[in-house]
């Protein structure tokens, strides 16, 4: 394990990045067990209309989440997914997405660019969903349909390193549930993927421990690199 004890003598920081890494498997496991309730609303929204594509609008860590989940969503749902930076969407790209479900993503719910994108999507008459990690965040005041990833917990994930893998999991679970209900993804493949996801979550602590061991065995060489 990384040596954090000395760093934690600085009392200004309640939680370190590695603490959030340690919390990720338990958060992912809880989300997986609660997947029906967690992604159910987004599944219902998507299935309510014959959307031709999904537009994921995001920046920062949310953009990474969208990148991680884009191709899984396309594969499981059988619809095109566009990934657009929040500023680009709000300033230039908001006009070109007919028959699309626009998902505006902000981990904190405070991104002013993503909030502006929500406003633009509504002005264009698009169906828009805002999703964040934090309940009652500022973005909730600008969108009628607001969802939560289900990964928020006491102490918050100030580094968003817990949020990236768990929020990616949220979208993969959404796509699988919606895909099988839509008939776009076979039931036997759905069951196989769910078992794989459960196995991956279970193995996350072991993988992290193996990475710790590798790092400690090679850190001198890594530190010497220029």
Cite the ranges covered by each PLM segment.
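N-terminal amphipathic/basic leader segments beginning at the initiator methionine
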Residues: 2-30
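Internal, active-site/partner-interface "lid" segment
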Residues: 16, 174-215
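Cofactor-pocket helix-loop regions in the catalytic cores of large enzyme subunits
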Residues: 29-34, 38-47, 195-226
């Amino acid at each position: 394990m990384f040596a954090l004890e000395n760093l934690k003598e600085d009392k200004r920081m309640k939680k370190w990045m590695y603490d959030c890494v340690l919390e990720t498997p338990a958060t992912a496991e809880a989300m997986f067990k609660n997947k029906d309730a967690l992604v159910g609303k987004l599944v219902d929204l998507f299935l309510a209309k014959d959307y031709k594509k999904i537009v994921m609008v995001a920046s920062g860590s949310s953009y990474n989440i969208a990148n991680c989940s884009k191709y899984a969503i396309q594969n499981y749902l059988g619809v095109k997914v566009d990934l657009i930076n929040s500023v680009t969407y709000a300033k230039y790209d908001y006009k070109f997405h007919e028959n699309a479900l626009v998902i505006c993503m902000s981990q904190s719910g405070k991104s002013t660019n993503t909030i502006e994108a929500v406003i633009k999507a509504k002005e264009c008459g698009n169906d828009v969903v805002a999703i964040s990690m934090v309940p009652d965040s500022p973005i909730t005041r600008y969108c009628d349909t607001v969802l939560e990833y289900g990964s928020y917990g006491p102490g918050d994930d100030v580094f968003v390193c817990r949020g990236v893998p768990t929020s990616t999991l949220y979208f993969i679970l959404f796509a699988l549930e919606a895909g099988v209900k839509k008939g776009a993804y076979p039931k036997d493949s759905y069951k196989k993927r769910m078992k794989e996801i459960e196995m991956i979550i279970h193995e996350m602590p072991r993988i992290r421990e193996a990475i710790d061991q590798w790092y400690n065995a090679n850190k001198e060489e890594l530190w010497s690199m220029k």
